[in-house]
Design a protein with these regions (language model features):
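Conserved hydrophobic/aromatic "anchor" residues
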Residues: 26, 86-89, 144
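Short pre-active-site segment immediately N-terminal to redox-active cysteine/selenocysteine motifs
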Residues: 27-30, 38, 74
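Mid-length scaffold segments of soluble, non-membrane domains
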Residues: 69, 76-82, 94
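Short, cysteine/histidine-rich loop/knuckle motifs that typically chelate Zn2+
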Residues: 33
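Second-shell loop/turn segments in exported
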Residues: 21, 71-78, 126-131
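Flexible coil segments in periplasmic/lumen-exposed cytochrome c-class electron-transfer proteins
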Residues: 14-17, 36-65, 84, 95-192
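Electrostatic cytochrome c docking/interface patches
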Residues: 7-27, 41, 80
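Bacterial N-terminal signal peptides
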Residues: 1-3
């Protein structure tokens, strides 16, 4: 019984370490600047979504995007998504509510479980900058969002604009390849 208890304790410690790492990444990447609470996990509205329609609404052309509730509330936040759906949102920019819980192995629509008609997260969500983070880092963020936050019931108005509008903007030609090309390139120092 002691061996089981010890293994269980190690598993709990590993999960807690992953959550703490995810918290550090969320704070250091300033998720709270848009999603609520600035960079302070002790703030009253930490990551529970846009509350001020003037300062946290992002006008982009004729559309407006609004930062969502990231807490694990089932009705108004991320509670109905799996950690893999959150991972896919961070890696591929896919809206978790419109993407199945599957491992994606390609960024080409219709291949490797990538949706044929993808619906992307709206700008200014910086998923394009995050896509080259390690799997471990992205899953740590997902773990923090799912298991490290208390659920808060706070409905944020949906962003305006057709869901397929962003698909024409998120192309390899505009944002570069994933994964990033190997180091060094012709523009970098280093031994080849």
């Amino acid at each position: 019984m002691a061996a089981f208890s010890s293994a269980s304790s190690r598993a709990e410690q590993a999960q807690q370490s992953q959550i703490l790492w995810g918290r550090q990444l969320v704070v250091s990447h300033a998720c709270g600047e848009c999603h609520g609470g600035n960079d302070n996990p002790a703030a009253a509205h930490w990551l529970d979504g846009m509350r001020d329609t003037i300062t946290q609404q992002f006008p982009i052309g004729p559309f407006h995007t609004r930062a969502k509730n990231l807490t694990p509330d089932v009705a108004t936040g991320t509670g109905s998504f799996t950690e893999r759906q959150i991972f896919n949102a961070l890696r591929y920019g896919l809206r978790p509510e419109e993407t199945p819980d599957v491992e994606i192995t390609s960024m080409v629509p219709g291949q490797g479980n990538f949706p044929l008609h993808p619906h992307y997260l709206a700008p200014p969500m910086p998923w394009v900058s995050w896509r080259n983070m390690s799997n471990e880092e992205l899953y740590a963020i997902a773990a923090y969002i799912k298991r490290g936050l208390k659920p808060v019931s706070h409905k944020v108005q949906d962003s305006d604009g057709p869901p397929d509008f962003w698909a024409s903007e998120y192309t390899v030609e505009k944002y570069g390849p994933y994964p990033a090309v190997p180091y060094p390139t012709a523009n970098e120092t280093g031994k080849r």
